[in-house]
Every structure is written in C-alpha cells, then in structure tokens.
Amino acid sequence: MSTWKSSLFLDSSSFLLEQLRFFHDHALLILNMITGAVAYIMISLLFNKYNHRFLLEGHTVETIWTILPAFTLIFIALPSLKLIYLIDEIRNPLVTLKTIGHQWYWTYEYSDFKKLEFDSYMLSYDNLNPFNFRLLEVDNRTILPYLSNIRLLTSSADVIHSWTIPSSGVKIDASPGRLNQMSFTLNRTGIFYGQCSEICGANHSFMPISIESISPSNFIKWVNKSSL
C-alpha cells in the first residue's frame, strides 16, 4: 500500500505489475505527444495572421486526422491486448491459493495441501507493535513462495469483496456463488499489504490483506509445520 511521502508507483513485487507499469509509460508517452501536438496547432492557429473566410472543405486534412488516430489506437491496443491475455493465462501453477471473503475478514485455503486453512483478521490497535502498520496488519499472514507461478481463486460467503495487492498488480473480485481466478508470480521476498477494494459494509475498511513472500524451501517447511 502507499505510505507516507509516496507519490509514484509502489516498488513492483511481481512480474505482472512490471508489465502494467511499462504499458502505463507507453500510453502516457503517446498521450503527451498528442497533447503537445494539439496544443501547438491551437496556439499557432490563434496567433497567426492567416485567414480563409470561405474554407468549406479540406480532404487532405480530413484524411490525415482520420488515419493518424487509427494508428495511434493500434499502438495503444496491441500492448493492452497482450496484457489482458497475460493476466488471464493460467500456466502450470505450483501453488493454488483459495480466498473467501467474509464480513469482515478473509479465509485462506491451500488446495494443494491437506488441513491447511485459516482465517485472517485485522489486528486491533492494542495488539500492534511499534513496527506494524495501522489497519494493515493481520493475525495470520498469507505465506507464498516467490519465483513460483501462483493461481489465485476467489469467492465470497456473503457480499461482493475485492482481493487486492497493489504492489503485485493483483485485483480480483470475490463474488458470492462465483469462483474467479487469476495468476501472478512474486519476484522477491518481503511483506506486501492490500485491502478489500469493494465497499462491502460498515467495516469495509477493516479487512486488510498481508502477504509474506518467502523462498520455496522455507515455504515447504512452513507447510509441513502448519499441516501438523
């Protein structure tokens, strides 16, 4: 999550967010070029001394401003389509994490392992230590291995929720009676925070998400310890 003195994007914790940032820069560059060209044309038209009172048509100009926007949209659409298919693609996941939203906490199930399921509640102010983030810390963190393809399944037991980790570029709705899925890969170790991003009731602001990314070997040790 964004913290103090932060006005830019978060440091990427997944390959997906890196691609989304590249696309953002690509689209922003094109938009800046369009804005500059339009501003230059408007200023030059306003401050020059040329006029044509009887100008009724200009086929050349109309052809130019029809073809150029078409090519511009193509240059924006192609990377966008690539990202859409990249987000939806599920390829040989090593870990499947099922997330169930409740009012107002999360339940996590590791479908690849037996007896590995827990609830995750926000820590109250009295239980925080000086190094915790207020409204973002939970009693049970979600443990995931880095450099591993992770399949995320989401659903809800009551109303619509949204499971979101901004630094990983992950945002997926958790709808009652429906199972949604997406995949992502964490590219480094660390602790990454998120929150429910769909207004789900009075305590919507108090159902945070906390992911702890660790090495695959330590993940296996944690699974063996938690499954006992």
From Swiss-Prot:
Its EC number is 7.1.1.9. Component of the cytochrome c oxidase, the last enzyme in the mitochondrial electron transport chain which drives oxidative phosphorylation. The respiratory chain contains 3 multisubunit complexes succinate dehydrogenase (complex II, CII), ubiquinol-cytochrome c oxidoreductase (cytochrome b-c1 complex, complex III, CIII) and cytochrome c oxidase (complex IV, CIV), that cooperate to transfer electrons derived from NADH and succinate to molecular oxygen, creating an electrochemical gradient over the inner membrane that drives transmembrane transport and the ATP synthase. InterPro entries: CcO_II, CcO_II-like_C, CcO_II_C, Copper_CuA, Cupredoxin, Cyt_c_oxidase_su2_TM_dom, Cyt_c_oxidase_su2_TM_sf. It is an enzyme of class 7 (translocase). The lineage of its organism: Eukaryota, Metazoa, Ecdysozoa, Arthropoda, Hexapoda. One of its GO terms (cellular component) is mitochondrial inner membrane. Keywords: Copper, Electron transport, Magnesium, Membrane, Metal-binding, Mitochondrion, Mitochondrion inner membrane, Respiratory chain, Translocase, Transmembrane, Transmembrane helix, Transport. Cu cation A1 binds at residues 161, 196, 200, 207. This is Cytochrome c oxidase subunit 2. Its cofactor is Cu cation. Binds a dinuclear copper A center per subunit. It is found in: Mitochondrion inner membrane. It is a multi-pass membrane protein. The chain crosses the membrane at residues 27-48, 63-82. Coiled coil: none annotated.
